[in-house]
């Protein structure tokens, strides 16, 4: 169906538009515009335009809280083929966190036995604005060359306003630089994911935008996980007598997360085993005294090669980050907690992908070993954390 038609029609399902019937524009802050058709919710959404190279896993991507305030461009040519199910949500309550979705082609037929609804229906239900019919190859090249850029999707009546006016609306949105967004996606109160079988350890996990596959990974290893809100004071988590502390992935600028940095410094000073993922890697790095910076267009995909400079091993990883730590492969430096080292870097561009204390008491990676979606190459990082807690437990028994 042509996306040039002006008719705004809906089918028998409330709020679901017929593909191509609603005009829409993707507008970038630099003045570049793309005409397409609206789907999902109809209206306006603003966010930073970023792209993901993942060919699968759009549901996991869209429900990942790390994508808060970002309009995600899918490089896969067709999205929606597997519909939407109740099992693959990565947010705690099934919420979609992307600000908007940009695609080339919207699948009209769902082909997955687990699907309970379509992508378009779920987006309409949750009020998420999408635009299709876009030359995503040209758009991704533009973002790659010019960098992630503020953007807006305008569909329906909103798309009829003058382009100059839409550009000004896009320009007026707040920057990702300096944005402390983890508190906006975190839970309000603690909750527990029990271990499968007898619990060997209890881990306190700070929810800065945690994906649900993380506590699942812990549970499968006999670890009880207490998920606490971002910025929960260190003194409060002592009540759980944690064997280890975990900091999750999350959105925003790590340079604005001073409270979390100070909490991690308290954890390190108490010599409690520490593991961090993604945003947690940046927080640990800052606790070590490292600086962060914003990447030009970030790393987002499920096929990113990372080298472990301690073992020499290369993993294919899932990634989603727009900020990174400043450092070099194998770099060693002194911290208030002992000697630290840059353990991992990305083979594509040399970006820091992991740091650790040489003592082994604290470590983190920039990528997502929990996957969802993505490869499982890095899942042994969870085993490493459990082994560290096992060692502590054995030492405590010997001392007793």
From Swiss-Prot:
It comes from the Bacteria. Pathway: Amino-acid biosynthesis; L-arginine biosynthesis; carbamoyl phosphate from bicarbonate: step 1/1; Pyrimidine metabolism; UMP biosynthesis via de novo pathway; (S)-dihydroorotate from bicarbonate: step 1/3. L-glutamine binds at residues 66, 250, 252, 279, 282, 320, 322-323. GO terms for molecular function: ATP binding; carbamoyl-phosphate synthase (glutamine-hydrolyzing) activity; glutaminase activity. It is an enzyme of class 6 (ligase). GO terms for biological process: 'de novo' pyrimidine nucleobase biosynthetic process; 'de novo' UMP biosynthetic process; glutamine metabolic process; L-arginine biosynthetic process. Pfam families: CPSase_sm_chain (PF00988), GATase (PF00117). Keywords: Amino-acid biosynthesis, Arginine biosynthesis, ATP-binding, Glutamine amidotransferase, Ligase, Nucleotide-binding, Pyrimidine biosynthesis. Residues 200-395 form the Glutamine amidotransferase type-1 domain. Residues 1-199 are annotated as: CPSase. The keyword Nucleotide-binding applies. The active site is at residues 278, 368, 370. It catalyses: hydrogencarbonate + L-glutamine + 2 ATP + H2O = carbamoyl phosphate + L-glutamate + 2 ADP + phosphate + 2 H(+). InterPro entries: Anth_synth/Amidotransfase (IPR050472), CarbamoylP_synth_ssu (IPR006274), CarbamoylP_synth_ssu_N (IPR002474), CarbP_synth_ssu_N_sf (IPR036480), Class_I_gatase-like (IPR029062), CPSase_GATase1 (IPR035686), GATASE (IPR017926). Its EC number is 6.3.5.5. PANTHER family: CARBAMOYL-PHOSPHATE SYNTHASE SMALL CHAIN, MULTIFUNCTIONAL TRYPTOPHAN BIOSYNTHESIS PROTEIN-RELATED. Belongs to the CarA family. Small subunit of the glutamine-dependent carbamoyl phosphate synthetase (CPSase). CPSase catalyzes the formation of carbamoyl phosphate from the ammonia moiety of glutamine, carbonate, and phosphate donated by ATP, constituting the first step of 2 biosynthetic pathways, one leading to arginine and/or urea and the other to pyrimidine nucleotides. The small subunit (glutamine amidotransferase) binds and cleaves glutamine to supply the large subunit with the substrate ammonia. Composed of two chains; the small (or glutamine) chain promotes the hydrolysis of glutamine to ammonia, which is used by the large (or ammonia) chain to synthesize carbamoyl phosphate. Tetramer of heterodimers (alpha,beta)4. NCBIfam families: CPSaseIIsmall, PRK12838.1. This is Carbamoyl phosphate synthase small chain. It comes from Corynebacterium efficiens (strain DSM 44549 / YS-314 / AJ 12310 / JCM 11189 / NBRC 100395).
